[in-house]
Amino acid sequence: MSNSTMEATQMKVKLAVDEMIDDLDKTYLRDMQKSMFQCSARCCDNKKTTRDAVENCVESCNDGMKKAQGYLEKELGGLQDQLSRCAMTCYDKLVQQFGPDVNKYSESQKLSFNEKLDSCVSVCADDHIKLIPAIKKRFAKNT
C-alpha cells in the first residue's frame, strides 16, 4: 500500500472514530464524569468516617465511568481487530492472485498489487466506518 494512500485511509478511520468519541463524550461521558466527581465529593463530606471508608466510597463512585470506558475500549479494540483482519484478507487474496513471492513480481505487478491493495483496504475502512453508529447505540444501551 502506498504511504500516502495508507495514511489517508488511516486518517479517515481515525477522524470517524474521534468524531464518535467526541459525540459520546458530549452525550454521555461528561455527565457520567460530573456525577462521579459529585459523588466523590459527597464521600468526603462526613468528617467522622475512616479514610478507608472514604476511599471505598470514591472507588464506588468511579465504577460507572470505569465500566463505560472499559466498554468503549472493548468496542474500539474489536473494531481495530476486524479492520486489521479485513486488511490481511485483502493482502492474502492478492498474494493468491499474484503469487506468494512478492520479490519476484515485475514492476507492473507490484504497481497493480499495490493499487488493488489500496483499493481493497479503503473499502475495508469504509465498511468499518459504517459500523460506528451501531457501536454508539450499543454504548448508549450498555452505559
UniProtKB/Swiss-Prot annotation:
Compartments (UniProt record): Cytoplasm
Tree of life domain: Eukaryota
GO cellular component: cytoplasm; striated muscle dense body
Keywords: Cytoplasm
Biological function: May play a role in locomotion and behavior.
One Pfam family hit: DUF842
The family this protein is said to belong to: Belongs to the FAM136 family.
Protein name stated in the entry: FAM161 homolog famh-136
Entry annotated with the keyword Cytoplasm: yes
